[in-house]
């Protein structure tokens, strides 16, 4: 399916304009568990332009990373931008940055000791990946995961993958239920996110009163975002009867589901849909902004109601970006942001998916129909010749990995370091890590890999320290080894190891640092 540049640009413009509208509408009601059903327009004084809102800020930082690193941008690069250019340290943001500084790489940084790993801070960053990969939800989901795992995991990560896939597909599909089905194919079917969205759809199909639907969605995956600023005895009773308190930090499933609920009940009306999202309470700037961006992509900027656009006057106000250095150029308007994004997209998707010399101008090649859904694993007989076969993990399979798998990609091979469920070690108790290598199926050569574990003097290795492993390129081929070591009582509180992989007869190599923290733990990791 072809997406011509003028249509694409209008949809990107609609995305950011809708994001801006929703964020401004919902901001005054954020962190409040209440039903805001009487709100039908902005409540702030906008005479001097929109108020700052963090829902758009971080994506401006990610755009700066893409402008420098292009399609090679990954979780590690985004982590560097977190440390340099993102100022807030609240909950998951601060924990993610703290873990990075301690030497824990993504996805460990987003998971370890992160009470808010399932919260809303990353699904609000999905639009940049959708706009850079229009009509390519598989690609958008891949980059959304790289973004999410820096400061989230599990349900928080699923939420960004879901919204990125949905918004990417929205460039070529407009039916809400079809788009929801597409996006759900990229996340685990048994996730709380999937259950909450299923409840939202069930309520709409059965025409449940919207107030009651809000309660049902909440109770399916109860979070606590609406309690952030209240003591327990300050929570309003009105409209909250029967609502469970929820689990702190478990906020993404219900808030994404609130956006879907409002979209369905809004039945195509931009303003009504956003006001319904706002009516649900909890993380209202996020739910409204995500829905506004989604509708903006579907409708395009030209079809968004002027009533909502005019008070904002195309302006962007930022809150969370470190502007004291030259690393990030902050756009002043939605138009400037749009121009910068559309300039990067052809390079981001590559020449196979974008023809810049097409008659009439730039044209994007988009997926359609079943091609928008997450692909299923190729079902080849193990051991077959892998030549010209796509046997990489699908986005859904990667999302299902535990956060203790740190993955690395190199030109001639990929590596997975499995921390085996923990980032801790205990002196005197054997500790293990598993290294898995997969050959590159673009280089088409069998090879041997030499894998070596380097440890400080305080750690004795009880397995072979160096192994030679064959890397074949048939279906299902992988090379795996487990290193076992024991730190003695002189070990520091932070133990740093190096896994070195070198290919025989090639200059390619890869080094992974493994960081472990001293703690009381059971043996057998």
Where are these regions (language model features)?
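Short beta-strand elements of extracellular/lumenal beta-sandwich folds
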Residues: 427-443
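Catalytic phosphate/nucleotide-handling subdomain of diverse soluble enzymes
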Residues: 21, 25, 32, 38-41, ...
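Terminal connector regions
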Residues: 447, 452, 489-525
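Low-complexity, acidic Ser/Thr/Pro/Gly-rich terminal tails and inter-domain linkers that flank the onset
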Residues: 358-426, 458, 462
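Short, hydrophobic beta-strand segments
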Residues: 479-490
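Short proline/glycine- and polar residue-rich coil/turn motifs
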Residues: 469-479
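Accessory "access/gating" subregions that flank catalytic or transport cores
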Residues: 100, 109-117, 131-136, 145-150, ...
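An N-terminal structural lobe/cap that precedes and organizes the functional/catalytic core
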Residues: 1-64, 77-78
């Amino acid at each position: 399916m072809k997406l011509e540049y003028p249509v694409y640009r209008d949809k990107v413009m609609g995305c950011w304009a809708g994001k801006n509208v929703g964020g401004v509408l919902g901001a005054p009601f954020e962190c409040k568990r209440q039903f805001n059903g009487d709100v039908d327009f902005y409540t702030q004084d906008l005479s001097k332009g929109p108020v700052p809102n963090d829902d758009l800020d971080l994506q401006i930082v990610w755009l700066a990373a893409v402008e420098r690193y292009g399609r090679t941008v990954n979780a590690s690069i985004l982590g560097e931008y977190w440390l340099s250019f993102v100022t807030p340290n609240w909950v998951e943001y601060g924990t993610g940055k703290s873990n990075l500084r301690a030497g824990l790489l993504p996805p460990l940084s987003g998971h370890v000791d992160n009470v808010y790993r399932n919260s809303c801070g990353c699904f609000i960053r999905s639009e940049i990946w959708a706009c850079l990969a229009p009509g390519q939800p598989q690609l958008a989901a891949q980059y959304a995961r790289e973004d999410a795992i820096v400061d989230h995991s599990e349900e928080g990560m699923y939420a960004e993958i879901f919204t990125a896939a949905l918004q990417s597909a929205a460039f070529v599909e407009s039916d809400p239920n079809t788009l929801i089905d597409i996006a759900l194919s990229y996340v685990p079917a048994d996730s709380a996110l999937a259950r909450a969205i299923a409840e939202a759809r069930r309520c709409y199909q059965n025409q449940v009163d919207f107030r009651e639907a809000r309660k049902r969605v909440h109770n399916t995956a109860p979070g606590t975002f609406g309690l952030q600023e209240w003591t327990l005895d300050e929570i309003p009773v009105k409209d909250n009867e029967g609502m469970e308190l929820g689990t702190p930090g478990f906020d993404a499933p219900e808030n994404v589901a609130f956006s879907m609920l409002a979209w369905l009940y809004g039945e195509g009306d931009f303003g009504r849909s956003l006001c319904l999202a706002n009516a649900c309470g909890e993380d209202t700037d996020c739910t409204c902004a995500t829905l506004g961006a989604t509708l903006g992509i579907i409708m395009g900027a030209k079809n968004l109601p002027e009533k909502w656009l005019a008070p904002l006057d195309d302006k962007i106000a930022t809150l969370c970006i470190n502007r004291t250095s030259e690393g990030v150029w902050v756009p002043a308007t939605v138009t400037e942001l749009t121009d910068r994004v559309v300039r990067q997209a052809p390079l981001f998707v590559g020449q196979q998916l974008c023809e810049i010399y097409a008659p009439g101008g730039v044209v994007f090649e988009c997926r359609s129909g079943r091609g928008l859904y997450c692909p299923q694993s190729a079902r080849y007989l193990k051991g077959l010749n892998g030549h010209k076969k796509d046997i990489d993990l699908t986005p859904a399979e990667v999302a299902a990995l535990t956060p203790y798998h740190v993955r690395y990609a190199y030109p001639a091979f990929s590596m997975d370091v499995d921390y085996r469920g923990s980032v801790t070690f205990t002196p005197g108790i054997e500790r293990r890590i598993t290294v898995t290598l997969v050959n590159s199926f673009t280089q088409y050569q069998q090879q041997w890999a030499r894998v070596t574990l380097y440890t400080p003097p305080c750690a004795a290795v009880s397995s072979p320290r160096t192994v030679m492993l064959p890397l074949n390129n048939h279906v299902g081929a992988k090379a795996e080894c487990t290193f076992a070591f024991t730190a003695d009582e002189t070990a520091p509180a932070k133990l740093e190891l190096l896994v070195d992989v070198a290919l025989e007869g090639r200059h390619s190599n890869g080094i992974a640092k493994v960081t472990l923290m001293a703690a009381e733990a059971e043996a057998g990791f």
